[in-house]
UniProtKB/Swiss-Prot annotation:
It comes from Aquarana catesbeiana. The keyword Signal does not apply. It is found in: Secreted. Belongs to the frog skin active peptide (FSAP) family. Temporin subfamily. Its main location: secreted. The keyword Membrane does not apply. This is Ranatuerin-6. It comes from the Eukaryota. One of its GO terms (biological process) is defense response to bacterium. Expressed by the skin glands. Keywords: Amphibian defense peptide, Antibiotic, Antimicrobial, Secreted. Antibacterial activity against Gram-positive bacterium S.aureus (MIC=100 uM). Shows no detectable hemolytic activity towards human erythrocytes. One of its GO terms (cellular component) is extracellular region.
Length: 13
C-alpha cells in the first residue's frame, strides 16, 4: 500500500 502511494508521489514529483 505505502509503496503504491510512494510511487504515485514520485510520479507527481
Amino acid at each position: 500500500f505505502i509503496s503504491a502511494i510512494a510511487s504515485m508521489l514520485g510520479k507527481f514529483l
